[in-house]
Amino acid sequence: MKELRVNANDAGQRLDRFVGKAVPLLPESLLQKYIRLKRIKVNGKGAKRDTRLELGDLLQLYINDEFFEKPREENSWLKVGTPRLSIVYEDENILLADKKPGVLCHSAGVWDYNTLIANIQAYLAQKGEWRPKEENAFAPALCNRIDRNTGGIVIAAKNAEALRILNDKIRDREIEKLYLCAVQGRPKPPEGRLENFLFKDAAKNQVYVKDKPEPGARSAVTEYRVLCSRGALSLVECRLLTGRTHQIRVQMAHAGWPLLGDGKYGRERFNRNFDEKGQALYSYRLRFDFPTDAGILNYLRGREFRVEKVDFAEKYFGIGDVRSLDRAPE
């Protein structure tokens, strides 16, 4: 039990709003529940959520100690009331989440609980699969990341052994990820390979294409194939053979087929015509190739997973379920 004394700066606030600010890790749903159950008292008595606090009031909070910790990335999951996840696949070792555009994988330098990892950790804690108090160091973790404005499949490991294996497999390129994108124009040829060198200006978070090797530029290879075209747009599937920052976006733009909605590498006037504010790019398909031993994850060898829905595929090409798309040749 913790006690809080209402001072001059706190007086006049509603009880629920005051406690919400004083205990930022406490989810709103739990806050309201604890008020109803009288686990939050004012001067020793239960109170309604809209009770106005007065100078000198003493609050008794019968709340678990972890909610009083300082907010940081590692405990941001505590703030999540009802996890918001779209799960593509789940077993005892891994979880594949369909991250929606606009959602951060991790917090961006400031404390934020509206992240994919916080929702996954809250989901597993609420299911009882992850018990933080029984762990010395491990917490469920993401094995790959996707930019905020890009959607798609993100892999989460539920235990340390799965995390180690998946990190190794990603490093050794034994997990294949394919992307859908909507681009301007009709790529010619309709199936091909883009090969050049990419130089990243970290200060500007901008990537530049170089046709020849030069200091700081890294080779980049993307295979693509056009799935269909409609009007001024084409739906393209891309396979990354290297993993460079903004690789698909910058290579497609350099080839003359910028991604719809791409504010950095696309064409502003074209994007305005469609009123798109985020790049039409989605990591929609994932395959565990695993040509070498995968330990406890060997059962995933050869398995492939896809998301069901990609908004721009439905909006511009009438494809409501992208699982129906023809499989790319292996």
How would you name each of these model-derived features?
Residues 1-330:
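RNA pseudouridine synthases
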